[in-house]
Amino acid sequence: MPTITIDDSPRNLNTVSEVPVFPGCEKYATKQERIECFSDHVAKLVHRKFDGSLGSELGLQGEQRIYVQFTVNKNGDIIDVKANSKSKELRKEAERVARLLPSMMPGKQNGQPVNVVYSLPIVLKL
């Protein structure tokens, strides 16, 4: 007898039929508008909350790249926050800021809520 399982693996923001809706982005109707609004709100939060002086305090120079990935789960909560950077301190700061993101309307595929992965590159120029 065949086994039926549900694929619960996170989907990419660009591959779901309905993207997660950041608070304040409900007014936009198209997927592209909602992606842009989502990205704008995330970027604004990072600009406001990320401690940009941290790199200088650590004696880092030049351009520092931090790659953050998180999942907006089926309930619209931010989970599985992970960052990658040469600096442990910058990685921790990026993860801290990503966890500040508010709950939102979850992404959907075929009308059903799904987990959606979002990747965010942060560039800190010192």
Task: Label every model-predicted segment.
Residues M1-L126:
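Charge-biased low-complexity segments
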